[in-house]
Amino acid sequence: TGEKPFTCNECGKFFSCTSWLNVHLRSHTGEKPFTCSECGKFFSCMSRLKVHFRGHTGEKPSACTECEKCFSSISQRNIHIRSHTGDKSYTCTVCGKIFTRISQFNVHVRSHTGEKPFKCTECGKSFICNSQLNLHLRFHTGEKLTTCSECGKCFTHTSHLNVHFRVHTGEKPFTCTECGKCLTRQYQLTEHSYLHKGEKPYTCTECGKCFTRRYHLTEHSYLHTGEKPFTCTECGKGFTRRSHLKAHSHTH
């Protein structure tokens, strides 16, 4: 019927059954309960683990009916089929990630360029997509605030609270397989991995300079815009970098 009666309380996305909703919720919490017995990699759902495990076994059960080429997953086969049908797919030239929808592709590209076209009219903060802006607006409206029991800090959704709470517990569930460093968030692990690979996927659209971390690109962009968002509460002096503000604060 196409009915999707189950709603994610974090982002409002709809699902046809509770099992898919539960898998989706892990994208907010960062939970990855399924572990590969061969390499130790973690996954949010069993189906992704099964596809990954075929990389170890060499199993490729999904065959193209046009040329009989085999793939480890149906999604890989479907992407390949477009080469026969002429259907469009959108590939990121920076990291190679493939998208079937232009809207998803455009949002992803902004993660590399640092472009944030959706601006909050209340405080001026910008975001790469409208859904992030809508979540942020809850800070101003006070909608559905959840509070940390340790320090009283408020959050718009529980996934942010769960990540914040690791500051108090010291939990760092994401481990680098190269050097063993532990991190509190998945995106921190992803950006840390670029240091080992030598990759710099975040590029300034003004001058072409590349960075391994998104916030380095954001701070760099202030040099072009002249913006100084980090302000000293003592004297009002503004800075383009948080580290410069911290160094300045010692003078007071």
Curated annotation (Swiss-Prot):
UniProt cross-references to InterPro entries, sorted A to Z: Znf_C2H2-type (IPR050758), Znf_C2H2_sf (IPR036236), Znf_C2H2_type (IPR013087)
Record-level GO cellular component terms: nucleus
Localization per record: Nucleus
Zinc finger (C2H2-type): 6-28, 34-56, 62-84, 90-112, 118-140, 146-168, 174-196, 202-224, 230-252
Superkingdom as given in the UniProt entry: Eukaryota
GO MF term set: DNA-binding transcription activator activity, RNA polymerase II-specific; RNA polymerase II cis-regulatory region sequence-specific DNA binding; zinc ion binding
Transmembrane intervals: none
SMART domains in the cross-refs: ZnF_C2H2
GO biological process: regulation of transcription by RNA polymerase II
Record keywords, A-Z: DNA-binding, Metal-binding, Nucleus, Repeat, Transcription, Transcription regulation, Zinc, Zinc-finger
Functional note: May be involved in transcriptional regulation.
Family as reported in the entry's similarity comment: Belongs to the krueppel C2H2-type zinc-finger protein family.
Name under which the protein is recorded: Gastrula zinc finger protein XlCGF28.1
Species this protein is from: Xenopus laevis (African clawed frog)
